């Protein structure tokens, strides 16, 4: 998987908002907000996409476990749920 280019993560109060930088990426009917953990995962996914051209659920799980004290099963569950929401929002590609 890889993130779609052209999105920037912005912090607004206690939440993070994903903003499309070009008019073709902007959908005025929905706003994509992340909590701190999802924002961390997005930043990792973007970094991996730039560096290697892709990211995997396993790599995000490893990054999540390195950053936060979370059990492997919970980390993978959180990552899979987050990736599913990104697919639904159409901000990643297979």
Residue ranges and their predicted role:
Residues 1-44:
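Acidic, low-complexity/disordered tracts enriched in E/D and polar residues
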Residues 30-94:
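Long, charge-rich, low-complexity alpha-helical segments
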């Amino acid at each position: 998987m890889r993130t779609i280019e052209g999105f920037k993560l912005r912090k607004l109060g206690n939440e993070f908002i994903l903003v499309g930088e070009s008019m073709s990426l902007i959908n005025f009917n929905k706003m994509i907000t992340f909590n701190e953990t999802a924002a961390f995962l997005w930043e990792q996914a973007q970094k991996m996409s730039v560096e290697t051209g892709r990211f995997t659920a396993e790599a995000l799980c490893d990054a999540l476990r390195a950053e936060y004290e979370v059990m492997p099963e919970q980390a993978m569950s959180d990552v899979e749920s987050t990736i599913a929401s990104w697919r639904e929002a159409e901000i990643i590609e297979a």
